[in-house]
C-alpha cells in the first residue's frame, strides 16, 4: 500500500503537471520560460547554471528548503519581491498544495 508520503508526492506531481510544467522542466539543464527544477530542493535561489535569472532571484539569499518553496508557491510576488514568476503565476491556494509540490520536487535528483 502507498504511504502518506507517497500520496503527497503523487499529488505534488499532479499539481506540478497542471500548474508548473508549462514553464518549468524537470530535466537537468533544460530550461523553459522558468528554470529547470531538477535538484531544486536544497539549492540556492537563482543558481541553476545556464538560466538568466532576475536580479531579485539571484540576490534573494534564499535556499530552496521545503518551507521556503511553500512560502514562494503561496505568495509568488511577495516572498521574493521583484521576481519574474510573480507576474505570471499567482501561486497555489493552500499550503498543503505547496507542500505536496515541494515533496515532489524533492524527488527530482
Regions found by a protein language model. Give the residues of each.
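Electrostatic cytochrome c docking/interface patches
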Residues: 1-15
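Extracytoplasmic/periplasmic, Sec-exported soluble proteins
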Residues: 4-8, 29, 60-61, 93
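The canonical Cys-X-X-Cys-His
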Residues: 12, 16-26, 85, 101, ...
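Detector for the c-type heme attachment site
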Residues: 24-29, 42
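Short cysteine/histidine-rich zinc-coordinating motifs and their immediately flanking basic loops
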Residues: 32-38
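Axial heme c-ligation environment in periplasmic c-type cytochrome domains
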Residues: 35, 50-98
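Hydrophobic aliphatic residues
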Residues: 41-45, 73, 105
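Short, solvent-exposed mixed-charge patches
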Residues: 108-109
Amino acid at each position: 500500500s502507498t504511504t502518506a508520503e507517497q500520496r503527497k508526492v503523487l499529488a505534488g506531481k499532479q499539481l506540478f503537471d497542471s500548474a508548473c510544467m508549462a514553464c518549468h522542466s524537470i530535466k537537468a539543464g533544460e530550461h523553459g520560460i522558468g528554470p529547470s527544477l531538477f535538484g531544486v530542493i536544497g539549492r540556492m535561489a537563482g543558481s541553476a547554471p545556464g538560466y538568466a535569472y532576475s536580479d531579485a532571484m539571484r540576490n534573494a539569499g534564499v535556499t530552496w528548503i521545503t518551507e521556503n518553496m511553500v512560502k514562494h508557491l503561496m505568495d509568488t510576488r511577495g516572498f521574493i519581491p521583484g521576481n519574474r514568476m510573480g507576474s505570471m503565476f499567482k501561486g497555489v491556494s493552500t499550503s498543503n498544495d505547496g507542500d505536496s509540490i515541494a515533496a515532489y520536487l524533492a524527488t527530482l535528483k
